[in-house]
């Protein structure tokens, strides 16, 4: 194919090439971030208490001298991507030369170990080989007439079976840590949306894992009788207190009764048919409360008309993650509305929260 020498067409071609190459090599930025997390760069700078020069950072990380220039090139990309910032500092005493030092930015502060907002386990889980290797089977998956996830097509087992085949596995622990770290971020949401839980006497957190979210709610509303409802192998060894109870069961069969049902990061794991069953069981769980009961959903509500292209891209990325791992989905407002009304609810309210998620209140 011959391309015109017209300047406009050449410019378009070059921009198209840049666009394609950028998306092809996006994985490099992800893996560089994972490397920074594994090395503990954010921890080193945080513990140092001030920006660190390249030599200080390499020394703190106990890197071989031959890796200092490699570290510089990783930091150059990560700084360009907004994870670190560069500043100029004076050299050591007696040295008049100035040096570049690296400091933390808001995104890299999310990698500081031990902080409630630490999301290192999210990075670790999302970029785990089990999450990445399956994509090599995508052509086979498209060409097979089987109702299975891409993960199943690649590994021969569902993600849940892979996760639960060994209750002591590091993979299960990593997944639980990732869910717990995301739940800790919920505290910010809770502080801004206390009204959602006011007036309630009881709440059941469906798929609540080890109870991270429920404990945060319980801190602010200690009178609230909370139940964490999850699979028996998840909650079997957990202990609560007078107002915090752990119950094992199957949300597709029934959900414990309460004034409100919380579904945080649950429905996007499932297709519409399965989600409809969960919502109907949730409606039954709050039936004793009449019109005063409600279901509280925290999930993504996709808005493809948003001016924030980065936000929309993240939401669409999540949609493909849910599809390929679970045959689940992220939903648009119209899809949420249909699902909610099909489950027999009378009204709902969607409030954007927490960056890319939404809080959806559903009423009988």
From Swiss-Prot:
The active site is at residue 268. GO terms for biological process: methylation. S-adenosyl-L-methionine binds at residues 206-209, 230-231, 250-251, 264. InterPro entries: COMT-like (IPR016461), O_MeTrfase_dom (IPR001077), Plant_O-MeTrfase_dimerisation (IPR012967), SAM-dependent_MTases_sf (IPR029063), WH-like_DNA-bd_sf (IPR036388), WH_DNA-bd_sf (IPR036390). Its EC number is 2.1.1.46, 2.1.1.212. Transmembrane segments: none annotated. It catalyses: a 4'-hydroxyisoflavone + S-adenosyl-L-methionine = a 4'-methoxyisoflavone + S-adenosyl-L-homocysteine + H(+); (2R,3S)-2,4',7-trihydroxyisoflavanone + S-adenosyl-L-methionine = (2R,3S)-2,7-dihydroxy-4'-methoxyisoflavanone + S-adenosyl-L-homocysteine + H(+). Keywords: Methyltransferase, S-adenosyl-L-methionine, Transferase. The keyword Transcription does not apply. The keyword Aminoacyl-tRNA synthetase does not apply. GO terms for molecular function: 2,7,4'-trihydroxyisoflavanone-4'-O-methyltransferase activity; isoflavone 4'-O-methyltransferase activity; O-methyltransferase activity; protein dimerization activity. Belongs to the class I-like SAM-binding methyltransferase superfamily. Cation-independent O-methyltransferase family. COMT subfamily. 2-hydroxyisoflavanone 4'-O-methyltransferase involved in the biosynthesis of the phytoalexin medicarpin. Has also an in vitro (+)-6a-hydroxymaackiain-3-0-methyltransferase activity, converting the pterocarpan 6a-hydroxymaackiain into pisatin. No activity with di- or trihydroxylated isoflavones, including daidzein and genistein, or with (-)-medicarpin and maackiain. The dual activity for either 3- or 4'-O-methylation depends upon substrate availability. Homodimer. PANTHER family: O-METHYLTRANSFERASE (PTHR11746). This is Isoflavone 4'-O-methyltransferase. It comes from Medicago truncatula.
């Amino acid at each position: 194919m011959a391309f015109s020498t017209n300047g406009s067409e050449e410019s378009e071609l070059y921009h198209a090439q840049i666009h394609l190459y950028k998306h092809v090599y996006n994985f490099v930025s992800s893996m560089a971030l994972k490397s920074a997390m594994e090395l503990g760069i954010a921890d080193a700078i945080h513990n140092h208490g001030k920006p660190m020069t390249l030599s200080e950072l390499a020394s703190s990380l106990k890197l071989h001298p031959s890796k200092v220039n490699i570290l510089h090139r990783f930091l150059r990309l990560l700084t360009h991507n907004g994870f670190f910032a560069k500043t100029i500092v004076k050299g050591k005493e007696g040295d008049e030369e100035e040096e570049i030092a690296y400091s933390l930015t808001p995104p890299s502060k999310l990698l500081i170990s031990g902080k409630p907002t630490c999301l290192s386990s999210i990075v670790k889980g999302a970029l785990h080989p089990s999450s990445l290797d399956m994509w090599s089977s995508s052509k086979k998956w498209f060409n097979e007439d089987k109702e299975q996830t891409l993960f199943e097509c690649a590994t021969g087992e569902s993600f849940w079976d892979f996760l639960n085949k060994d209750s002591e596995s590091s993979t299960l622990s990593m997944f639980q840590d990732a869910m717990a770290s995301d739940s800790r971020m919920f505290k910010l949401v809770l502080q801004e949306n206390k009204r959602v839980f006011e007036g309630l006497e009881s709440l059941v957190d469906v798929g609540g894992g080890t109870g991270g979210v429920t404990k945060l709610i319980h801190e602010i509303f200690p009178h609230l009788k909370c139940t964490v409802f999850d699979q028996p192998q998840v909650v079997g060894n957990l202990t609560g207190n007078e107002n915090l109870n752990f119950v094992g069961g199957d949300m597709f069969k029934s959900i414990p009764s309460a004034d409100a049902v919380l579904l945080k990061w649950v429905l996007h794991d499932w297709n519409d048919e399965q989600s409809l069953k969960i919502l109907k069981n949730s409606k039954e769980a709050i039936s004793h409360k009449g019109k005063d009961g409600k279901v509280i959903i925290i999930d993504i509500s996709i808005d493809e008309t948003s001016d924030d292209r980065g936000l929309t891209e993240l939401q669409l990325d999540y949609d493909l993650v849910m599809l390929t791992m679970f045959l689940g989905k992220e939903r648009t407002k119209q899809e949420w509305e249909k699902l909610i009304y099909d489950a027999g609810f009378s009204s709902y309210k969607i409030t954007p929260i927490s960056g890319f998620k939404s809080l959806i209140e559903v009423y009988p």
